[in-house]
A protein has these predicted regions:
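Hydrophobic alpha-helices of bacterial signal-transduction systems
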Residues: 1-152
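Conserved binding/recognition cores within well-folded domains
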Residues: 151-187
Length: 187
């Protein structure tokens, strides 16, 4: 799943760490906001709601990764990007079904009952949020992989960076350290 490249493994792990941290912060802010705006709800409910959402998001983070590996943002042919539609739907469905099941379990253990309401309208609401999250995860994967590959280029020993000069059919490679200035012939 992660590939044999160390870059891909690190891309997934760094993205996972960043996503888990950012979503935890957002969920903590949601708990604070709910507790402030509706103090009659207490703290337990919002903690269970936001905690179950965070946990299932983390558990199903591999789904956007699969989508990214199937169709990175700059993939050719472009129609392959359509692979993100079923992946985003699967991610949202697993996230929502997962947190609903966790909430039902926690409420049951506490001697209570959790009611998510009508599934379709609530799922469509969550789908919009999860689709945005999915897109941000894909962008995060692309950014992190790009940065890691750039770092890898810099750290490669003995590598000299060159600038290609084309003059008709002739190609001249000049070491970047030998270039003082670049000007165009106006073509």
């Amino acid at each position: 799943m992660l590939g044999t490249s160390g870059t891909l493994r690190r891309t997934f792990l760094y993205a996972f760490a960043v996503a888990a941290t950012l979503v935890a912060v957002i969920n903590a802010l949601n708990v604070i906001t709910i507790s402030h705006e509706e103090p009659q709800l207490g703290l337990a409910g919002p903690l269970v709601w936001e905690g179950s959402s965070w946990l299932t998001l983390v558990l199903f983070f591999w789904i956007p990764w699969i989508g990214y590996r199937l169709a990175p943002p700059f993939v050719r042919p472009r129609w392959r990007l359509l692979a993100h539609i079923p992946c985003a739907l699967a991610f949202a469905l697993c996230h929502v079904a997962g947190f609903v099941l966790l909430r039902k379990l926690v409420y049951w253990l506490a001697g209570s009952r959790y009611d998510f309401g009508a599934f379709l309208p609530h799922f469509l609401y969550e789908l919009r949020k999860d689709s945005l999250g999915y897109a941000l995860f894909i962008a995060g994967f692309a950014l992190i992989e790009h940065l890691l590959r750039q770092q890898q280029l810099i750290e490669t020993p003995g590598q000299s960076f060159t600038f290609d000069i084309r003059d008709g059919a002739k190609l001249t490679r000049v070491s970047l350290s030998d270039i003082l200035a670049v000007a165009s012939a106006g073509n």
